[in-house]
C-alpha cells in the first residue's frame, strides 16, 4: 500500500481508467476547476483504500511560456484547493513535478496538522521552480513562504 497518491487527471485516466465524473477535461481550454477533480480523488481512494491522501496537480496551458498552476489535496473526505498561480514567463518546466513533491513532503512534515498549508507550500515551491533554469529547485523556504503570503493576484514574480 501507499500513504500518498500524487499525479494528475491524465495519469489517473491512462494508468487506472479513472475519469472525472460528468466532466470533460479536454473541453476546458486551459482553465481548471479543482472541484471537478474531487471525483478522481474519491475513485483513487476507493481503488487504494489504505492511501491517506490523494494530490492532483492542476496545470492550465495558455501557451508554452504561460501556464496556470495549482493543486488539490483530498484527505479524510475533505478537498483542499490551493491558490491558482499565473506563471507568465516560464523559464524551465523540467523539475516542476519533483519540486512539487519535495515541497509537499516538506509541507506535510512541517505543517503536520494543516493539509491546506502543506498543499499551498508544495504548489508555491513548484511554481517558483518554473522561474529557474535546470532540473532542481534552488529557492529558499522564505521565498516560498513569501509567495504563499502573496497579494492575492496569483501573479508570480521572483
Regions found by a protein language model. Give the residues of each.
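Conserved phosphate/ATP/ADP-binding segment of small-molecule kinases
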Residues: 1-78
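Conserved post-catalytic alpha-helical subdomain immediately downstream of the catalytic base
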Residues: 80-151
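Structural signal for terminal/edge beta-strands and the immediately following C-terminal loop/tail
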Residues: 153-158
Amino acid at each position: 500500500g501507499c500513504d500518498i497518491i500524487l499525479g494528475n487527471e491524465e495519469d489517473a485516466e491512462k494508468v487506472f481508467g479513472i475519469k472525472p465524473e460528468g466532466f470533460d477535461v479536454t473541453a476546458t481550454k486551459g482553465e481548471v476547476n479543482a472541484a471537478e477533480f474531487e471525483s478522481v480523488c474519491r475513485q483513487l481512494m476507493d481503488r487504494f483504500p489504505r492511501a491517506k491522501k490523494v494530490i492532483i496537480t492542476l496545470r492550465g496551458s495558455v501557451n508554452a511560456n504561460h501556464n496556470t498552476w495549482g493543486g488539490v489535496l483530498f484527505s479524510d473526505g475533505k478537498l483542499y484547493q490551493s491558490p491558482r498561480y499565473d506563471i507568465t514567463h516560464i523559464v524551465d518546466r523540467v523539475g516542476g513535478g519533483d519540486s512539487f513533491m519535495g515541497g509537499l513532503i516538506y509541507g506535510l512534515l512541517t505543517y503536520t496538522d494543516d493539509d491546506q498549508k502543506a498543499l499551498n507550500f508544495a504548489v508555491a515551491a513548484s511554481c517558483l521552480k518554473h522561474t529557474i533554469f535546470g532540473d532542481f529547485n534552488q529557492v529558499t523556504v522564505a521565498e516560498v513562504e513569501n509567495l504563499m503570503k502573496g497579494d492575492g493576484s496569483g501573479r508570480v514574480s521572483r
